[in-house]
């Protein structure tokens, strides 16, 4: 095996610590070609699609990419921001927020972000850390709930990059923070602030709050993936923080792909059923998405909204994701700081002189 070239030992002697925020990824542009390139990488990950690759690659290349590339590009174009993809824009803002917060608290760390699919990728970010003299790395996935198809594959990519290094850094991983008090507080604050600006649902009159998490195939639950249980845990803690019960709030799962059974109840049919049952207002919040993206802005804000209205609902509210919210940046900083304990990340303080 050929290892990557190492920087000069004088650079490696900097003994710096790096924090790498890792999110899913996004196309570089809202065009069919860019979307197909992104989807090809994403859907070729055996952690994401757990069927024999020989069969799957034929279907992917001949049917799925040609059909979904153009359709998905139109959806991305509908949510694209002037600065670029929403997921990348908000992840960059989160990175800058954490960087500033840690620096203001005397942490001497390098903070950056990477995407599991697309760019900047994890290997590139770790290589940049190495060039900067980083010898300790904290991998911080932006997935509060652990899943093999998100958290584990992010770690896979990081470990694959490390396997090519002759001089490897120390590494720590943040596996999940689905029940972390600071994360739950940030979620509750996001909902409260939205209601303060747009009015609180009239729960006594039957209005509902729906907590929509990204779905995964049900078989992963049967095979031991803890994702479903952690989503339910987050949902229960958020309901408690908001003073709500399952009569006013429910947990659903979105973004089903293919014909296999996924975690239920499904978000879109649930919203249509609520509208048909006479629910006047439905608010939807996506606690598992730490940054707004195609699945929240387009799928929830447009497709699911249409389902609710078609069912007979009157008022639909999509509560924005955590994005760059002050409470969320604080929560990220707190979780990162907890996982940096024991590493020399602050400047040495001189001894007090009596």
Swiss-Prot record:
Location in the cell: Cytoplasm
Pathway: Porphyrin-containing compound metabolism; protoheme biosynthesis; protoheme from protoporphyrin-IX: step 1/1
Binding site for Fe cation: 214, 295
Xref: CDD domains: Ferrochelatase_C, Ferrochelatase_N
GO annotation terms (biological process): heme biosynthetic process
PROSITE patterns cross-referenced by the UniProt entry: FERROCHELATASE
GO terms for cellular component: cytoplasm
Record EC number: 4.98.1.1
Chief site of localization: cytoplasm
Catalytic activity: heme b + 2 H(+) = protoporphyrin IX + Fe(2+)
UniProt keyword annotations, A-Z: Cytoplasm, Heme biosynthesis, Iron, Lyase, Metal-binding, Porphyrin biosynthesis
Classification via InterPro entries: Ferrochelatase, Ferrochelatase_AS, Ferrochelatase_C, Ferrochelatase_N
GO molecular function: ferrochelatase activity; metal ion binding
PANTHER family reported for this sequence: FERROCHELATASE, FERROCHELATASE, MITOCHONDRIAL
Function per UniProt: Catalyzes the ferrous insertion into protoporphyrin IX.
Family: Belongs to the ferrochelatase family.
Name of this chain's protein: Ferrochelatase
Native species: Burkholderia ambifaria (strain ATCC BAA-244 / DSM 16087 / CCUG 44356 / LMG 19182 / AMMD)
Gene behind this protein: hemH
